[in-house]
């Protein structure tokens, strides 16, 4: 039997990741009418645009679900988000502005926790709203089978019968109204939004055009910092880490990481911090474009990176950054719990994050405009007296530097000889306009 089912398995339990929106509501009721036994599973990911989670399972029962559960995923989501922060698992940047992989982190948590809940209920068929062109279909496929090797996957949006009957939002709305649910289709936006406590993703529709900019987006986690009528006062904020864990904001300690991140979101959101516009490569190697929000993670990341650069040596930082980019790509591909990802992640958490203790004061202004005002840590290896231009007791003398220059640069002769070889074989063209005019025609 194939893992992916192309038609509805009638008479069997089918779990659906149920958001309460039009698509999953119509799909659930349609499956019920067609003879399946639908079960609804809703992930509480702290979505900033959802204000009544408890009502969602009730609606699922109303639409025909044989069972409905609300799974609180917030603690696990924040734990994985902080792990990504500690390991720098972010590979998508544009001109130094970072996408914090908030959707891939959310999928790792949702895909494992919902399927685990389904397994408890004896539900071994899973459906969700991901389409065949996106990343999520592969992420959910991997995470679902990782948790339940007996899992079968049924997606209404891959079932031609469902598509023929309910292929669009207008058809779904009419279907629900005819069923007596008086479902009012929400106003169509110029883009689609997916969010969790870590961040929000805006993409598709009008945002598919690169002629449409960030200004068409209405932020849900912060302010539209580009608007002249939005008043934003500069604000100083302190962030404290202990052994790699964020523990305090503005001197207020948080025992619950979820509450700390919510407060970080509020602080960063007041300034529009952490918004970015990215062109990225999807898993299938086609490019897509997204506009992202992550005010809290952006705030924590500024402080964390500052401490990393002040505490660790150059080679450690280089490994942290290189491994972080590799890990970010694995996370994006739905491989956050694969052995190669665990190896990279735990290396960073053990050897980089554990030394990160200290406090950073930051002045936030508009958008991603900020300044670091102070950096304190008992673990700093930054010691200005080593390089002071003033007359102070030095850790090394001019004679020491002469010896270092001599020993460190013995290869200059070798380099000069190699450049001559390259010139002789035509790889370099010496001359007045050359980057290396000084080697032209020189003989040994």
Curated annotation (Swiss-Prot):
Q: Does the keyword ATP-binding apply?
A: yes
BP terms from Gene Ontology: argininosuccinate metabolic process; L-arginine biosynthetic process; urea cycle
Q: Which domain of life is it from?
A: Bacteria
As its record notes, the protein acts as a catalyst of:
L-citrulline + L-aspartate + ATP = 2-(N(omega)-L-arginino)succinate + AMP + diphosphate + H(+)
Q: What is its EC number?
A: 6.3.4.5
Question: Binding of L-aspartate: at which residues?
Answer: 131, 135-136
InterPro entries (UniProt xref): Arg_succ_synth_type2_subfam, Arginosuc_syn_C, Arginosuc_syn_N, Arginosuc_synth, Arginosuc_synth_CS, Arginosuc_synth_type_1_subfam, AS_cat/multimer_dom_body, AS_multimer_C_tail
**GO MF term (any one):** protein homodimerization activity
Query: For this UniProt entry, what's an example GO CC term?
Result: cytoplasm
**A Pfam family for this UniProt protein?**
Arginosuc_synth
**Subcellular localization, per the record?**
Cytoplasm
Q: Kindly list the positions annotated as binding ATP.
A: 17-25, 43, 129, 131, 136, 194
Q: Which UniProt keywords apply?
A: Amino-acid biosynthesis, Arginine biosynthesis, ATP-binding, Cytoplasm, Ligase, Nucleotide-binding
Has the keyword Cell wall biogenesis/degradation been applied to this entry?
A: no
Q: Please give the pathway this protein is involved in.
A: Amino-acid biosynthesis; L-arginine biosynthesis; L-arginine from L-ornithine and carbamoyl phosphate: step 2/3
Sites binding L-citrulline sit at 99, 135, 139, 192, 201, 203, 280
Q: Which PANTHER family match?
A: ARGININOSUCCINATE SYNTHASE (PTHR11587:SF2)
Subunit-structure text: Homotetramer.
The Swiss-Prot or TrEMBL record describes its family as follows: Belongs to the argininosuccinate synthase family. Type 2 subfamily.
Q: What is this protein called?
A: Argininosuccinate synthase
């Amino acid at each position: 039997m194939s893992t992916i089912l192309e038609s509805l398995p009638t008479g069997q339990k089918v779990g659906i990741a149920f958001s309460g929106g039009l698509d999953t509501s119509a799909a659930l009721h349609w499956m019920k009418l067609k003879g399946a036994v639908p079960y609804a599973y809703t992930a509480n990911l702290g979505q900033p645009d959802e204000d009544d989670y408890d009502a969602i399972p009730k609606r699922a029962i109303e639409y025909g679900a044989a069972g409905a559960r609300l799974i609180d995923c917030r603690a696990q989501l924040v734990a994985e988000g902080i792990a990504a922060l500690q390991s720098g698992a972010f590979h998508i940047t544009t001109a130094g502005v970072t996408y914090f992989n908030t959707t891939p982190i959310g999928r790792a948590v949702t895909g494992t926790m919902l399927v685990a809940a389904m397994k408890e209920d004896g539900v071994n068929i899973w459906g969700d709203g991901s389409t065949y062109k996106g990343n999520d279909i592969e992420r959910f496929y991997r995470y679902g089978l990782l948790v339940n090797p007996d899992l079968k996957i049924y997606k209404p949006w891959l079932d031609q019968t469902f598509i023929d009957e309910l292929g669009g939002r207008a058809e779904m709305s009419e279907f629900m109204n005819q069923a007596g649910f008086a479902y009012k289709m929400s106003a169509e936006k110029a883009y689609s939004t997916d969010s969790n406590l870590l961040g929000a993703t805006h993409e598709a529709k009008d945002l598919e055009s690169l002629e449409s900019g960030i200004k068409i987006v209405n932020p849900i986690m912060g302010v539209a910092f580009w608007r002249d009528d939005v008043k934003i006062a500069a604000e100083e904020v302190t962030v404290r880490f202990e052994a790699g864990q964020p523990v305090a904001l503005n001197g207020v300690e948080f025992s619950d990481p979820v509450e700390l991140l919510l407060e970080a979101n509020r602080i960063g959101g007041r300034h529009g911090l952490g918004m970015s516009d990215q062109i990225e490569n999807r898993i299938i190697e086609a490019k897509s474009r997204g506009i992202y929000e992550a005010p809290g993670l952006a705030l924590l990341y500024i402080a964390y990176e500052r401490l990393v650069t002040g505490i660790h040596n150059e080679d450690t930082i280089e490994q942290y950054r290189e491994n972080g980019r590799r890990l970010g790509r694995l996370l994006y591909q739905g491989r956050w719990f694969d052995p190669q990802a665990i190896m990279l992640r735990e290396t960073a958490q053990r050897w980089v994050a554990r030394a990160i203790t200290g406090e950073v004061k930051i002045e936030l202004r508009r958008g991603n405009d900020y300044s670091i005002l102070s950096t304190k840590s008992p673990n700093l290896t930054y010691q200005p007296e080593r390089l002071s231009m003033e007359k102070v007791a030095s850790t090394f003398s001019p004679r020491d530097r002469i010896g270092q220059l001599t020993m460190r640069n013995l290869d200059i002769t070798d380099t000069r000889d190699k450049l001559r070889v390259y010139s002789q074989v035509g790889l370099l063209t010496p001359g007045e306009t050359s980057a290396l005019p000084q080697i032209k025609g020189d003989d040994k």
